Amino acid sequence: MGDKTFFTLPKPLPGRLNVVFTLLQKPPRIKGVKWVSGDPKKVLKELRKMGYKSTILGGGAYLNTLFLKKKLVDEIVLTIEPKIFGKGLSLFNEDFDLDLKLLSAKKINHNSIILRYKVLH
């Protein structure tokens, strides 16, 4: 995730390594957080060397766009909630075309649905 997203959280997400992309020169030392910068492909390679087989990108528009343009995303999971925010938050910060294939649609409660898509590169 990006540092803007991370700093909206009350604390690091439990039970996992929180990898946070940042441009901060001296990010704070926080248990369970790995601060990174630079090429996402290199970061993913380093995580694989550490034994991680899969990752979840919980980024904002900038990171989502960066990872997709580098073809580093193989699935997109969207949660549909019964709430409309007007302009809302953008998922991406640039225009591009992306073809998806629906893998699953799961109703998680009486109002919410999780859609899982495969990214077709």
PLM features per residue range, with description:
Residues 1-121:
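Enzymes that bind and transform nitrogen-containing heteroaromatic metabolites
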